[in-house]
Amino acid sequence: MNKIIAANQTLTSEAVSEGHPDKIADQISDAILDEILKEDKNAKVACEVIIAQNLVVIAGEINSPVKKNIDIKEVAKNIIKDIGYTNIDYGLDYKTITVIDAIGNQSRDIINAIEKKGSNALGAGDQGIIFGYACDETKNFLPAPYELANSILKKASNLRKSGAIKWLRPDSKSQVTIEYDKNRNPVKIKNIIVSHQHHPNISQKLIQQTIIEEIIKPTVQDKSMLDENTAYCINPSGNFVIGGPTGDTGLTGRKIIADSYGGFARHGGGAYSGKDATKVDRSAAYMARYIAKNMVAAGISKEFELQLAYAIGIENPISIQITGGINDPKYANKILNFIVNNFDLTPNGIIEKLKLKQPIYLKTCTYGHFGKNEFEWEKLDFVKKIQTALKK
């Protein structure tokens, strides 16, 4: 990676709210996963959702005896209600939706590959390329445009749900462009885009004024990054009344960049939501983030990107590589040796370290999977050990 950034170069990230159709699908997938894990911590789950108009189709594979105990249709309805889709005029109504349950059983071939007979070891649930990333741009070790894009939508969601801004509806997106100096420090916010669903009888002028003054500006912590040249694009398409799945079909796993690092890091292509922790697309991505965050917090580099690669049925990664943040090959090899010798990167090791058999996943899947400090992969408990072994 090692991005070369010239003075006055801009970088951009986007985010989506919990009411975006793809995020509705992610939340239903992860809510079902959580309900299964509450009764069976060893369940194998791959849950996919498509949502269009007033129809929700839940598919995928679940291997667990408790599957029959879960009212999957009720789980989906409760998620939609909690998001705020309580009226068909909003684009979806939990009271009238049709839910189709098309979940099957996990392939016996895959089960046999993951679970080794006569052993407690777990093989990887699939092949995959996984990246973890961190940088020093924010206190959460995330890219500044990405964190701000998410923070704006979280603020809007809070104001909508509290009733402070009654004409906001659930569906929304944001995009933030920030200017960087030659030392790769964010210095100015160049552009902020917010597209937010709204009640039909609200003027565009009021929408623009409210979103800028009551949502965006209070969210920007460093006011010096805003100036007279900052451009605000609020609902640039005009009316945004038709939203939710009436306006756009939603699908689990379609917001993988918004889920991770907002385009600042590579992505192997595997989505997170709806997958139990034997799926390394998810669990190894969390572990790679944990390692990268501790490396940056330890002062090893301003940014750090780690690639892991797995083969189905095999415990250990088949490849580990530092793909960003370290320019010295000898130092990179030293760091790699440290990673191999100090972090258990098998599925079992990751699951145990990050406590991934708990029903935590619904909380992960909105406004990014990273930067939420209640989760194990965000802890900075390896910093001192890294500094002792690796600090130049």
Curated annotation (Swiss-Prot):
Cofactor: Mg(2+); K(+)
Binding locations of K(+): E48
UniProt keyword terms in alphabetical order: ATP-binding, Cytoplasm, Magnesium, Metal-binding, Nucleotide-binding, One-carbon metabolism, Potassium, Transferase
Region (Flexible loop): 106-116
Compartments, record wording: Cytoplasm
Residues the record lists as binding ATP: H20, D171, S172, K173, D248, R254, K255, A271, K275
Catalysis: reaction(s): L-methionine + ATP + H2O = S-adenosyl-L-methionine + phosphate + diphosphate
Top-rank EC class of the record's enzyme: transferase
Any single Gene Ontology cellular-component annotation: cytoplasm
Entry-linked Gene3D superfamilies: 3.30.300.10
Cofactor: how and how many bound: Binds 2 divalent ions per subunit. Binds 1 potassium ion per subunit.
Residues that bind Mg(2+): D22
Enzyme Commission no: 2.5.1.6
An example Gene Ontology molecular-function term: methionine adenosyltransferase activity
GO BP annotations, alphabetical order: one-carbon metabolic process; S-adenosylmethionine biosynthetic process
Pathway it works in: Amino-acid biosynthesis; S-adenosyl-L-methionine biosynthesis; S-adenosyl-L-methionine from L-methionine: step 1/1
Function: Catalyzes the formation of S-adenosylmethionine (AdoMet) from methionine and ATP. The overall synthetic reaction is composed of two sequential steps, AdoMet formation and the subsequent tripolyphosphate hydrolysis which occurs prior to release of AdoMet from the enzyme.
Family according to the record: Belongs to the AdoMet synthase family.
Subunit description: Homotetramer; dimer of dimers.
Protein name: S-adenosylmethionine synthase
Organism: Borreliella burgdorferi (strain ATCC 35210 / DSM 4680 / CIP 102532 / B31) (Borrelia burgdorferi)
Phylogenetic lineage: Bacteria, Pseudomonadati, Spirochaetota, Spirochaetia, Spirochaetales
